[in-house]
Structure formats: C-alpha cells, structure tokens
Amino acid sequence: MKRNRLARRPLLLLLSLLMLLGIFSTASAEESTNLLQNPGFEEIGADGLPVGWKTDAYLNLEGMTFYTVSDNAMSGAHSVQIENLDHNDARFCQTVAVEPSSFYRLSGYVKAWDTLDEGLGGNLSIKDVYVFSESVYDSPDEWQYVELYGVTDTDQHEVTVYARLGGYSGESFGTAMFDDLSLVKVDAPPEGIVASRWYQPTAAVQDDTSDDLADTAAASPAWPWMTAVGIAYVALGV
C-alpha cells in the first residue's frame, strides 16, 4: 500500500505542476489583452484625429490648445500631440469597460518639451480622480515609459483614461506626445507598488471591498508562488 502511494507521488506532482502552469498561462493571457481601442493611434478618422479617442480640456478657448496626429512615433506610423500655448489641462480621452474590484495597469510612452517643469507636464491619468503617472517635462528626443496601477470600485464598470498635458490644479503649457498606450487587467500590482483608487471614495470607504483588495495585494505580492508551494506539498503528501 505504501509502495503504491509512493509510486503515485511523481504523477500527482506532475499533474499539480501542469495545473499550475495552466493557471499562470491564463493569467498571462489576461494581462496581455489591451482594452484600449486604437492604442497606437494608427487609425485616423475623417476629422484628422485618432479613431476611438476624444479631446477635452479645462479651458476650451480658441487658439489655446492644439490636438494633432504626428508621424514622430514610438512605433508604427503615428502618435498624438497636445500643444498648450498657455497653461491648460488638455487631454486625449477614451472610456473603457472594466470589471468591479479588479486591478489594472495603464501605461504608455510620452515625450514633452517647453513645459519648464511647471504643472503636471505630460502624463497618463484617470478621469475624476487625482492620480497620475510619472510626469514628463523635458524629453524632446526620447520616449519615456510611464505606468499607473489602479483598482476599481465594487460596482464600477467603466473608466475614462487620459493622455494628458497638465492636470487638476497642475495646468501646463508646452508640448507633449503620446504613443503605444495600454490598459490591461492584472492579478495584482508588482511588489512595492500600491494601486491607486480609480474611483471616488465614499464615507464607508473603511468597509470597501476594493480597499481590502488593494491592501491584500500590497501585503502579499507573492501569493501565486505560495499557491505553487502549497500544491506541491499536497502532491507529495507532506
């Protein structure tokens, strides 16, 4: 009886590892799905602007802000450009369907110049909440990669992302360019990264499941490997 059980251990371990590989493969495929439409701005509409994107600004004054498509691209043929001739908060924006109580990563490449380190410069951000990626101020010859991790609310089903020059109480002038943007669902932020709330907190925020989810991910970034160890131990009968 003992011999049979020992003989089964390698098979059980192999099956456990195959199951684990399946779990990680599914997670990897999920994380690779870009939820943005026309994220590289390659498809241009009749109005001369990228399909799937809208423009918006804090100050919509004639001659203050210009939105254009450029052939100076990180990849492909096009990128987008925002030029503020005076201090403004201007952006390309897109609303995307998301899942409640879930983690996401917004990322992309940014160039900026003539901003003089004022305001929030070129950045990626989320509508209606004060969260921003790293700001880019003076990078006319080099694309800089920026990213932002967030968590959705328990009943949240959409989010509006901004490719932005300026920000709330951080208006900027100058020029910023954006290319190869990405919004993907992730299992959790990387170790040491805290996901920001991509929603307006309520008075009952202490009991919010999304906040508990963010705290758990920040405290336990290595949960997949702990799961792997547990499966292996069970398979070996330890």
Located regions from the model:
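Sec-dependent signal peptide cleavage junction
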Residues: 21-32, 214-222
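Extracellular glycan-recognition surfaces and repeat-rich motifs
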Residues: 42-79
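Extracellular carbohydrate recognition
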Residues: 142, 167-186
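Extracellular carbohydrate recognition and processing domains
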Residues: 128-158, 171
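Beta-strand acidic-aromatic groove motif in beta-rich domains, primarily in extracellular
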Residues: 50-53, 90-92, 114-128, 159-161
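Secreted extracellular polysaccharide-interacting domains
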Residues: 79-105, 125-135, 164
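C-terminal cell-surface addressing/anchoring modules of secreted/extracellular proteins
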Residues: 196-238
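Extra-cytoplasmic beta-strand recognition segments
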Residues: 39-41, 80, 90-120, 146-152, ...
